[in-house]
Amino acid sequence: ALTKQYGNYASYCMLACGNEPSGRWVPWVSKFVDYWKATDPRHVYTGASVGNSWQWQPHNQYHVKAGARGLSWTGAQPESTSDYRNRIDTVKQPYVSHETGQWCAFPNFNEIRKYTGVNKANNFEIFRDILNDNHMGGMGHDFMMASGKLQAICYKHEIEKTLRTPDYAGFQLLALNDYSGQGTAL
């Protein structure tokens, strides 16, 4: 039904069977990729989006993996000339970075009242209480603004580094939405 309804849409060019599977998933996703390659060759297929420690999927037409991303600022000063080529140059298929970024920003405590019911921002309340307990309750807004600026700088650096990398097929960002309560991965 998916391919009949949407198969010719310009935005439907890639398909993965899932995200971060567990168990004995490589044989199953290999069959998934082989099935779809034979059934509908208009698109390219991968088994799943995975972290760096997950196995490589040998039947993929492209890989979505977390390995070639991140900042190197712990071992060197920030710069704007490096790329990730040495982390993808041995991969034969196109490489897409899985969940690029995930740079956290301090929460906006003024939003706590907006989250109710199952979406109640208990984690925000905990962070606010920790600040209050340490006599820094009035600094929440400053922390939010400073961490938000750092978050923007980190995303900019990482995305630009990805775009500078020859043959890098792209990147995925995690949870671009208005609700900032995905656990504490804000």
Locate the predicted segments by residue:
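Substrate-binding/catalytic cleft of secreted carbohydrate-active enzymes
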Residues: 1-170, 174-177
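Extended hydrophobic/aromatic segments used for targeting, binding, or gating
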Residues: 180-186
